A protein has these predicted regions:
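Extended, aromatic/histidine-rich regions of cofactor-dependent oxidoreductases associated
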Residues: 136-212, 216-222, 229-231, 271, ...
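Metal/cofactor- and membrane transport-associated sequence elements
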Residues: 239, 278, 293-295
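Histidine-anchored, small-residue-rich loop motif
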Residues: 2-174, 238
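Solvent-exposed loop/turn segments at secondary-structure junctions
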Residues: 82, 105, 116, 245-249, ...
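Short, conserved helix/loop micro-motifs enriched in His/Cys and acidic residues
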Residues: 235-267
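Mid-length scaffold segments of soluble, non-membrane domains
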Residues: 265-277, 286
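Stable alpha-helical elements in mature extracytoplasmic
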Residues: 94, 106, 117, 121, ...
Length: 545
């Protein structure tokens, strides 16, 4: 048995239980965040959101707690305010998600997910205002909120995170790798690998951990040691990419904002994953010949046991390389990356590679989690707000698409904010070196990466660094390099764009306009950066002439 003493000692405690509707707070805030009500209770202008309004009646939290059904209406509390959101729930697709938060105060949820602390979320909620809480109950809710914040106290310490990542949110922690670090090595180190968390990082006692595998008829479980020691290990090199990578580039004045974490190009990484083939596990329990889907559920749950979950088709689950991984680049998984066990579904969007997995369910149905049923889907461009969508009619995303991005030259400044980047060619060979990554998605290999300096009129082939991989099992990314002679570089600002083509002839669209969707997923348009040659280099070159 391999040694795991360090991890056992580090993680052999469990946090105290904290009561909160953490997941529902995220979903509720997301639904409110873009919807402007046309049918509402009382609208009160010139009022600070959630503050006491003497003209309105008083309702206690015990009264609010009674309103959790269609018959009684759906009530919520926020600060001193009481809100009846029944019409929102009943009249708008997606409103049913609020049912899980009905009868409660929202502070605990929204304090954790600070993305909802914006004016138009509060303003929309205020349109449903019907009353006030009694004096003292707001304070009680806020005291409870202070306890809820302890939920994140067991998150791992992230030393020097600002040097490595562009941090998109602290709670939950979401951070993308700075571009220059992405292309500094073919394998992305654990320390440099992007982090996408949907909730807090769970603490696991490895001595008590059990992996449950079940279908509708039976349930079995394995300890961590049983899984690692009794099943043959398998290693693959695979990129993992968030479906929202490059989301920020989809924002435009004509079509509107792409909602979600505003990733630049760094929500991707490439690593060697070691674990047990999911196929071997299912076969050992006789679960490989039934069910249409395999669901994965993680330990990142609220205390109502609403956990992060996703699913993949059975056909994919039984393929050669889907893993229950316990090692990343030859080391035990870190806490942020799913210790002790995570799913790796190569060629598929990162949302399906569930971290901290402790339940696997073979079923005829997809996972019924919010992230499978009402997120990570490409909505039609006519949908400007998620509340307009009938999510049941839109399939859940699975395979990634062909992708490429420019990572060097780059800056420590957030790429979303840079308009023009000042660069200096090498004094040694008088060339400007451009580097980036490409990924085929779905197991398709990258055939070529091309660079253009004139907005796509002419193209040049980049040099590729890639693994030899089996047909339709090209899970690893490709790194590419292109050198521009200084004599070919204009003195004024100029654009560089890149595009990739896979072995099936799939390539990238020139702009995001034709693939825009309100959730900003699967943006694989040409990546463009604007450069300006450093004045000192131009001056020196002029003197040499």
């Amino acid at each position: 048995m391999r040694s795991r003493l360090a991890v056992i000692f580090r993680q052999s405690f469990r946090p105290h239980i904290i009561t909160t509707g953490i997941t529902t707070g995220l979903v509720t805030g997301y639904l409110f965040s873009k919807y402007k009500s046309t049918v509402h209770a009382n609208t009160h202008a010139n009022v600070i959101i959630g503050e006491r309004m003497p003209s309105l009646p008083i309702y206690s939290m015990s009264e609010v707690a009674k309103h959790t059904t269609k018959e009684s209406g759906y009530w919520l509390a926020y600060k001193d305010g009481v809100y009846d959101v029944s019409s929102f729930v009943e009249n708008h697709p997606g409103g049913k998600q609020i049912l899980k938060t009905a009868g409660k105060a929202l502070e605990s949820c929204w304090k954790i997910f600070t993305i909802h602390q914006i004016d138009h979320v509060y303003e929309t909620l205020e349109q449903y205002r019907i009353g006030n809480l009694p004096k003292g109950e707001r304070e009680a809710n806020e005291k409870h909120q202070e306890t809820v914040l302890d939920l994140f106290q067991y998150d791992p310490e992230r030393v020097n995170a600002n040097e490595t990542f562009f941090i998109r949110s602290q709670r939950p922690f979401n951070a993308e790798t700075k571009p220059n670090l992405l292309v500094s090595s073919f394998l992305t180190s654990v320390e440099n690998f992007y982090v996408r968390n949907h909730m807090h990082v769970p603490v696991v006692n490895i001595n008590e951990f059990k992996l449950e595998i079940r279908n509708e008829k039976s349930s079995r479980s394995l300890s961590y040691d049983d899984l690692v020691d009794k099943y043959k290990s398998h290693t693959i090199t695979s990129a993992v990419q968030c479906a929202g990578n490059r989301r920020a580039a989809m924002n435009n004045e004509h079509q509107g904002a792409a909602l979600g974490t505003q990733w630049y190009v760094g929500a991707i990484g490439n690593a060697r994953w070691t674990g047990v083939k999911l196929r071997d596990l299912l076969e050992s329990f006789g679960l490989d010949k039934e069910g249409e889907h395999v669901q994965f559920w993680g330990l990142d749950c609220d205390t109502s046991q609403r956990c992060y979950g996703a699913s993949i088709p059975m056909e994919k689950a039984l393929s050669e390389d889907v893993l229950l991984a316990y090692e990343m680049n030859g080391e035990l998984l870190s806490s942020d990356h799913g210790y002790p066990l995570r799913v790796i579904v190569p060629g598929t969007i990162g949302a399906r590679s569930v971290k901290w997995v402790n339940r696997i369910i073979v079923s005829d149905k997809e996972a019924d989690s919010h992230w499978q049923m009402s997120d990570y889907k490409i909505l039609p461009p006519s949908i400007k707000e998620p509340q307009q969508a009938d999510f049941d009619r839109v399939p859940a995303l699975q395979e990634s698409n062909v992708q490429s991005a420019i990572c060097s030259p780059s800056s420590d400044e957030d790429g979303n904010k840079i308009k023009v980047l000042s660069v200096k060619p090498s004094d040694k060979d008088k060339r400007l070196t451009v580097k980036g990554y490409a990924l085929g998605g779905g197991g398709r290999a990258i055939q070529n990466v091309q660079i253009s300096l004139d907005h796509g009129k002419t193209w040049f082939q980049a040099e590729l660094e890639q693994l030899a991989q089996p047909h339709m099992r090209a899970w690893s990314w490709t790194l590419w390099t292109y050198h521009i002679n200084a004599s070919d570089i204009p003195s004024k600002p100029f654009d560089i764009v890149c595009r990739a083509m896979d072995t099936h002839g799939n390539t990238q669209p020139d702009t995001p306009l034709g693939i825009w969707n309100v959730r900003g997923v699967m943006n694989n348009a040409w990546h463009k950066i604007t450069l300006q040659i450093d004045d000192s280099f131009l001056k020196k070159a002029k003197e040499l002439k």
